[in-house]
């Protein structure tokens, strides 16, 4: 019915305009003929001025008709509701442009599509920047329902996202940075890998096992602590190393109840200095109380590390644990350290350290990360020197937001100085901010080798990283610089 009505209206308008035009032409011709007796040099009819017609005339429409006289099918197009999402949501100026009815119909249609199309983590079907990704059932269980689908923020529009009315920018951003939760502490093998939850993992058969039910291996058990005391005598240029005691040490059950245990120390100079304590009978708290003195200049000591190896002498000589500390803070003031003993590594242990600077710029809503220097870097097995670079990834709620890297520089005497500054913008929706910093080496054959990594967050397993993050967040605009030992995994 609607199609026939519109068709008849179009025909009526077309033929009405044609008859009107013919009548006006006849009237002009009769008037000119009656006045031809008194007028000389009447111009032809074709030269009479006619008001230009707006739109299409009859001849144009008739020329488009088929030559065989077939009837042209007139089809009424189906109209659908459409809506173009503004670039910035939540601004009243954009919302006022929509009428109430259109806004209501859009909201109803959006709710219907969201509820019928996908029953998982919420996302915006009208967001033109959204890219659909398939989530396996296991991954959908790992992420909480309130996690929103995020994108890699790189455009100017994203970086200048406006705040909602009535929100306090500084207090809100500081709250997001400081209130991180344990449920999003995850491990990433690389920037492109899928994060694995710390609460459960899948074995090779695909079954989930809680960490509480997994038996810890020898590399994961707490192997005790070694207490030492350091002092530097500036007048005699001597370092005094006192091995105090070893507590809560564990050893293989095949070694019996009371094996004899000794401590071996190494000053990692260009020509290493070794020393060894006397053997003591194994117990829960082994008292050594032995002091070792070496005449070495302070500036040489502050560039090396002091490593310890815990060894059994009877019934079998074997290294059951090791630990180390940096002598950078060595001074004339006597300091006592409690070192955590870890399982001995079958490969060379990563001793690399990285100097980082952080600054929370609350006014500009961004975090400034400085990659300053690295030391104790591994040496090459070939005469050619290695080159090093650092990769930095910023995660929010377990998802990668930004990734950057430094330039490639050659090492000199086991040290590299970058002095580079990276800027990471923040927005209101980003929570549980975590930085993953990885150090890589590159050989002459362009092969990349992983050296070590460091997590900087409130829940990092590195105490220095936790302290630096807390000091950065609680003191905006202050640059906090600290050295960190990299973890090999």
Curated annotation (Swiss-Prot):
Sequence positions bearing Phosphothreonine: 213, 215
Annotated ranges, domain C2: 222-341, 343-470
Region (Disordered): 189-214
Record-listed Phosphoserine modification sites: 82, 155, 167, 173, 210, 217
Native source species: Mus musculus
Protein name: Tandem C2 domains nuclear protein
Comp. bias (Low complexity): 191-210
Motif interval(s): Nuclear localization signal: 446-448
Gene name as annotated: Tc2n
InterPro entries: C2_dom, C2_domain_sf, C2A_Tac2-N, C2B_Tac2-N, Tac2-N
Predominant place of localization: nucleus
Location of the protein in the cell: Nucleus
């Amino acid at each position: 019915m609607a199609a026939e009505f519109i068709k008849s209206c179009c025909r009526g308008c077309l033929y009405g305009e044609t008859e009107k035009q013919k009548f006006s032409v006849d009237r002009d011709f009769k008037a000119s003929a009656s006045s031809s007796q008194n007028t000389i040099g009447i111009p032809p009819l074709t030269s009479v001025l006619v008001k230009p017609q707006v739109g299409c005339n009859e001849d144009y429409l008739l020329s488009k008709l088929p030559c065989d006289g077939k009837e042209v099918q007139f089809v009424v197009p189906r109209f659908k509701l459409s809506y173009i999402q503004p670039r910035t949501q939540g601004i009243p100026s954009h919302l006022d442009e929509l009428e109430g009815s259109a806004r209501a119909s859009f909201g109803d249609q959006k709710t219907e599509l969201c509820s019928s199309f996908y029953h998982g983590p919420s996302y915006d079907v009208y967001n033109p920047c959204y890219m659909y990704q398939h989530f396996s059932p296991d991954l959908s269980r790992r992420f909480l329902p309130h996690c929103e689908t995020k994108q890699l923020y790189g455009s100017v529009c994203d970086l200048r996202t406006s705040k909602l009315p009535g929100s306090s920018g500084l207090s809100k951003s500081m709250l997001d940075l400081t209130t991180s939760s344990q449920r999003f502490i995850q491990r990433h093998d690389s920037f492109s890998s899928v994060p694995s939850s710390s609460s459960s993992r899948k074995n090779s058969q695909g079954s989930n096992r809680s960490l509480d039910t997994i038996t810890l291996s020898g590399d994961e058990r707490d192997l005790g602590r070694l207490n030492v005391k350091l002092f530097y005598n500036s007048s005699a240029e001597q370092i005094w190393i006192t091995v105090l005691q070893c507590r809560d040490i564990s050893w293989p059950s095949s070694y019996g109840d009371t094996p004899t245990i000794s401590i071996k120390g190494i000053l990692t100079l260009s020509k290493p200095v070794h020393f060894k304590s006397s053997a003591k009978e194994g117990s829960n708290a082994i008292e050594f109380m032995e002091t070792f003195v070496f005449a070495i200049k302070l500036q040489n000591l502050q560039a090396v590390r002091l490593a310890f190896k815990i060894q059994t002498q009877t019934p079998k000589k074997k290294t059951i644990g090791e630990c180390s500390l940096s002598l950078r803070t060595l001074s004339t003031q006597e300091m006592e350290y409690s070192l955590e003993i870890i399982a001995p590594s079958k490969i060379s242990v990563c001793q690399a350290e990285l100097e980082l600077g952080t600054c929370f710029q609350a006014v500009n809503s961004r975090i400034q990360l400085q990659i300053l220097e690295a030391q104790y870097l591994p040496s090459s097995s070939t005469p050619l020197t290695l080159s090093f670079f650092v990769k930095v990834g910023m995660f929010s709620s377990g998802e990668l937001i930004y990734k950057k890297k430094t330039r490639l520089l050659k090492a000199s005497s086991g040290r590299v100085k970058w002095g580079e500054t990276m800027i990471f913008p923040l927005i209101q929706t980003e929570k549980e901010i975590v930085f993953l910093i990885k150090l890589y080496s590159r050989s002459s054959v362009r092969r990349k080798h992983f050296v070590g990594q460091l997590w900087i967050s409130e829940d990092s397993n590195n105490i220095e990283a936790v302290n630096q993050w807390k000091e950065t967040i609680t003191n905006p605009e202050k640059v906090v610089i600290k050295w960190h030992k990299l973890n090999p995994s």
